[in-house]
Amino acid sequence: MASLIYRQLLTNSFTVDLSDEIETIGAEKTKNVTVNPGPFAQTGYAPVNWGPGETSNSTTVEPVLDGPYQPIAFSPPSEYYILLSPTVPGVVVECTNTVDRWIATIAIEPNVSKTKRTYTLFGITEQLTVENSYADKWKFIDFLKASTNGSYARYNILLSSTKLCAVAKHTDRLYSYIRETPNAGQAYYAFSHNIFNLTAHCDFYIIPWAQQSLCTQYINTGLPPIQNTRNVVARHLSARSIITRRAQANEDIVVSKTSLWKEMQFNRDITIRFKFANAIIKSGGLGYKWSEISFKPANYQYTYTRDGEEVTAHTTCSVNGVNNFDFFGGSLPTDFGISRYEVLKENSFVYIDYWDDSQAFRNMVYVRSLAADLNTIECTGGTYEFSLPVGQWPAMTGGAVSLRVAGVTLSTQYTDFVSLNSLRFRFRLSVEEPPFSITRTRVSGLYGLPAANPNNGKEYYELAGRFSLISLVPSNDNYQTPIMNSVTVRQDLERQLGELREEFNALSQEIALSQLVDLALLPLDMFSMFSGIKATLDVAKSMATNVMKKFKSSGLATSVSAMTESLSDAASSVSRSNTIRSISSTSSAWTDVSSRVADLDNAASTVSTQTATISRRLRLKEITTQTEGMNFDDISAAVLKIKLDKSAQIAPNTLPDIVTEASEKFIPNRSYRIINNNEAFEAGTDGRFFAYRVDTLEELPFDVQKFANLVTESPVISAIIDFKTLRNLNDNYGISKEQAFNLLRSDPRVLREFINQGNPIIRNRIEQLIMQCKL
């Protein structure tokens, strides 16, 4: 019987599990490889297609030391240091909130005995007593008054060999420096009002508040050498406000355009969030040894707002050029040891692949002029405790590195369902304080970021920046770049399946009934079923596995699996109660309506609904207990075989979907019958039901309780020739009792005789079934 193909797919589904298991083992197999990172070192994570390469760019998002600027009066933003560099003694800077604080800093050169000097402070001439007994250091004195008519009092003093001082407003405080270089530190005044007016009387620099340690370093040790050359010239502060003609962030600009193509420049602000992943593997034995602490690629998906638009982004963080360390506390089994732990240092690289759902990435196919600017970020390691069975636990703690972007390239990541055109940012590393150590061991003072706890309890690291690129896209915005027509493997397959469905449905008119019946009686297996398909012979094994893999998730396979579990539960229920024959518990495996059948008076459903529910399970009963008669699955499998042989568009990649869809959708309106002596019960998936005598075809009242009981005891037969067709055949042609009984059993020999004789009623019924075989 042709329906053997469906039973083979059901019973051989274990090969799918085996195939999946083999693929999983292959995917998880690892190999220890020593990597020597070169100038173009890349990770092996995901296949990539390189674009035009990186474009060098020395622009930084925010300068660490911005200046020098010429003397000026202005209101500096908070969260910034104003680093002042006077060249002559006198008033250096004046700060006020115009309410209760007027602070002036005065510089006194070395070797000045106590004397009175005249200064102009906030427009008023003042005489102040000053002195500096140091021979090699300048003295910076803060004079403060609390009202416009008050007198100045001396406050903080800074002794400096670098001739530098600084002020900064942060929250409700005004910070300055005190003590003596090279050990100068910060002090502050209460500065509670938002107004902050500053007048600088010498050249000055601007440093972000986040670089507090760097500002303190400049105060104590001096500016970098390049700032002390004659080539550095102070500029006016208004230079910071020059309006440039460069494109702003988050804009789409048409660079050039023809009738078919246009070049679009995409400028985007981006927020990159990433995290490290690690693997900590403990060795066997007594629990004192660890075999590996290593970095692993980590995916992270998140959303953020860009110009009022919510953007969904995806990053993958991976590393390369790691340094392998080890530690062995001794040769005893109870001595703590780590066979290998990875550390990121100056020779390492960090790669971050970034993709988001904006228009720029949808058209990132033909690209030029790719550039990116990103801030620097510091990654600090946390603490990881090694839990030993006995004794104090050692802990790996500390370590830090800074990530600075070294280049950006295009990369394309392919999966089974989607192709992501992404940006790959390459970061160079520099080690930072603090060093890492393993407590209660001799390992200490090592620099780098170990893999034990690289995220330090943070969900993610975040850095900001921007990128710009010029992409070649179709002039018509309704079209997309050619590669986007095949953006997913699944999208191509759906298009092929759509064309194939149309062709399949059109082929129904070309099927010969005699050929169909003959083919339905053949015991088709998978290879004879698919032998007519081009290019399947060379890939027969993989093709069969793919068909079974797809068929395993079909509605038919799922229903059979659920039915088997229900039968097992019902059988165990019967075996536990030998004295009671529980028909309802057994029939529930087939009908799912045992509770409704048990008490028809209280049932909310009609008989039609109950029989329709039962009939949906009758196919499962029939397919597991095959009879000699022809069934609906024989016809649907034969139709499928004929159409596969006639189709010009079928291919191995579309075959699994076609077979699965045919098993679920071919002949949706089915009727099944059960014969009990001289009575026949017939129920259809459309809710129709009949009970009639076999010899006279006289209709009888339908007993749904008896029908439900017979389902569990009697074989189920496909009603190829249903009751309506039988009665029509008997009324017009007259049939014998034997012929009627053979048609009720769907005897293929009798069906072939009627078709060969050209009987229009039987022929019309078979043609109706064929026309139902549509996708």
UniProtKB/Swiss-Prot annotation:
Site (Cleavage): 230-231, 240-241, 246-247
Cellular component per GO, a single term: viral outer capsid
Keyword presence, Nucleotide-binding: no
YGL motif, short sequence motif: residues: 447-449
Disulfide bonds: 202-215, 317-379
Keywords (A to Z) from UniProt: Capsid protein, Coiled coil, Disulfide bond, Hemagglutinin, Host cell membrane, Host cytoplasm, Host cytoskeleton, Host endoplasmic reticulum, Host membrane, Host-virus interaction, Membrane, Outer capsid protein, Viral attachment to host cell, Viral penetration into host cytoplasm, Viral penetration via permeabilization of host membrane, Virion, Virus entry into host cell
Coiled coil spans: 483-510
Region (Spike foot), start-end ranges: 509-775
Segments for region (Spike head): 65-223
InterPro entries in the cross-refs: ConA-like_dom_sf, Rota_A_VP4, Rota_VP4_MID, Rota_VP4_MID_sf, VP4_concanavalin-like, VP4_helical
Motif (DGE motif) on chain: 307-309
GO process terms (BP): permeabilization of host organelle membrane involved in viral entry into host cell; virion attachment to host cell
Protein name listed in UniProt: Outer capsid protein VP4
